[in-house]
């Protein structure tokens, strides 16, 4: 494990105005990244953002830092994170930068990088950037300063790319879909993709104002989507998170379909078509029901650490093409290089159309075991998981489950949260046991 000062599991993230998400730091980050990336030849960086109000400030700071290092910035405006990975590849840019805090509230923001291949930066490159950050900022000669430009057709390019992952012999004609874009980066992309493929689209969360991103909408809160699907008598609902790398769905009965179920549907369809090479990667948080359902299909399944970068690492290690987190990060390496909510959703839609089945029936081969996740916020630098009382509470729960469930306690990689997950056969028992551990974590925090 590398010991980064600034880079977390998903780039650099925090509250805007607090270190490190300040204009002066982000300017220097742009300069430091520019110094490292300039060693590799190309002088162009693609920069995209989600819809947070702070994105304007931070992209200006990045531009100044990159220019001082002699690199040019090409801006896309609000675009999904996976779109920047795609555009970085197609423009042969040295790197892509996304200004986003994904599913976090609007007052947070972050910076994450993509390599020339459209994948997250290797640890050694992040370490090299951190080493440059420790040095005093310098500026290249005026004749070598970087320039700024805008990619005017970025959205159109990405829309066509997404549509190209949907089978050319199929159409969404006759399907009514409610789409919730979380007032985030997919708001002007996802509805167009679905309409151009033939669907009737009802939109939610497509009016960003800079401060309503992820606010009681999108993949992290599907209650509004569930009620709208029922009210519209729609065939299904699709929700993305603020930066578009996650997808959660809702069937025609208003029931939530999470990342585990989406992974199951896609894997089963790949298997049916003879296109599943190897197995499937989930995480420690993946529901036991997914593992059991894949076992019935004869599909190998392994778990990685939580975090889409670790899912990808495990996929690359095994040589497999499909992986996902239950939160809705779905990685399909035969389609793209990173988690992409729009593209993952399209693969589920193609399974629906190709099998003449609704989403509810497609998911029926997998039974989710009751799983309760409780997030406990903590303050300070101490680790509540090191507490003897927390360990005792966890051991007590393990004993009560008696081998017929799972307990997982972990720190969030992006927020000051302890995630308490308990899984078992009985919903009431699982909820009670999860809150028993959560109470111990709160007391320790």
Curated annotation (Swiss-Prot):
It is an enzyme of class 5 (isomerase). It comes from the Bacteria. The modification Phosphoserine is found at residue 102. Mg(2+) binds at residues 102, 241, 243, 245. Activated by phosphorylation. Its EC number is 5.4.2.10. Its cofactor is Mg(2+). Keywords: Isomerase, Magnesium, Metal-binding, Phosphoprotein. It holds the Pfam family PGM_PMM_IV. GO terms for molecular function: magnesium ion binding; phosphoglucosamine mutase activity; phosphomannomutase activity. The active site is at 102 (phosphoserine intermediate). Gene3D superfamilies: Alpha-D-Glucose-1,6-Bisphosphate, subunit A, domain 3, Alpha-D-phosphohexomutase, C-terminal domain. It catalyses: alpha-D-glucosamine 1-phosphate = D-glucosamine 6-phosphate. GO terms for cellular component: cytosol. One of its GO terms (biological process) is UDP-N-acetylglucosamine biosynthetic process. The keyword Metal-binding applies. Catalyzes the conversion of glucosamine-6-phosphate to glucosamine-1-phosphate. Belongs to the phosphohexose mutase family. This is Phosphoglucosamine mutase. The gene is glmM.
